[in-house]
Swiss-Prot record:
This is Peptide deformylase. Its cofactor is Fe(2+). It is an enzyme of class 3 (hydrolase). The gene is def. It comes from Buchnera aphidicola subsp. Baizongia pistaciae (strain Bp). It catalyses: N-terminal N-formyl-L-methionyl-[peptide] + H2O = N-terminal L-methionyl-[peptide] + formate. GO terms for biological process: co-translational protein modification; translation. Belongs to the polypeptide deformylase family. Keywords: Hydrolase, Iron, Metal-binding, Protein biosynthesis. The active site is at residue 134. InterPro entries: Peptide_deformylase, Peptide_deformylase_sf. Fe cation binds at residues 91, 133, 137. Binds 1 Fe(2+) ion. The keyword Nucleotide-binding does not apply. Its EC number is 3.5.1.88. The lineage of its organism: Bacteria, Pseudomonadati, Pseudomonadota, Gammaproteobacteria, Enterobacterales.
């Protein structure tokens, strides 16, 4: 299909809160396919629709050990969290930058899949971190929001 343009920090459109999807149709399927094409092209493991200027609640994830197939989450909601873990995270919207972020170690998430079927996923480790990171994008939150104001200011100056 096609590779979409990824919004880069400090673009204000990254702060837009995504809207839930009420109907999964060909238009939504095409968005999902283009999101996977974009994520693979950029060598990412996850991508939220808001990162490609589409304000809809869609996440795509792949290339993670726990997955044996690409994962699509539409209207995802974390329903349970437990434990804490920290890991170095990167973001396609903040190129060449990584930071250690503390997140829930285990989560349970409900969502619709590519076909509109309701799914419930219990996960931990890298997949858990990736899902939390991408859901943050859907609510206008970036990994830098977990960092100090001084670190944010330095990154903002670097990316302008």
């Amino acid at each position: 299909m096609s590779v979409l343009k990824i919004l880069k920090y400090p673009d204000d459109r990254l702060r837009i809160i995504a809207k839930p999807i009420s109907k999964i149709d060909t238009k939504i399927h095409n968005i999902i396919i283009n999101m996977f094409d974009t994520m693979y092209y950029e060598n990412g493991i996850g991508l939220a629709a808001t990162q490609v200027n589409i304000p809809l609640q869609i996440i795509v994830i792949d290339k993670i050990e726990e997955l044996n197939h690409p994962l699509v989450l539409i209207n995802p909601k974390i329903t349970k969290r437990s434990g804490l873990t920290s890991i170095q995270e990167g973001c396609l919207s903040i190129p060449n930058y990584q930071a250690e972020i503390s997140r829930s170690k285990k989560i349970t998430v409900t969502a619709l899949n590519y076909f509109g079927k309701r799914i419930k996923l219990k996960t931990s480790s890298t997949l858990s971190i990736c899902i939390q990171h991408e859901i943050d994008h859907l609510i206008g939150k970036l990994l830098i929001d977990y960092l100090s104001n001084l670190t944010n200011l330095k990154l903002l100056k670097k990316n302008k």
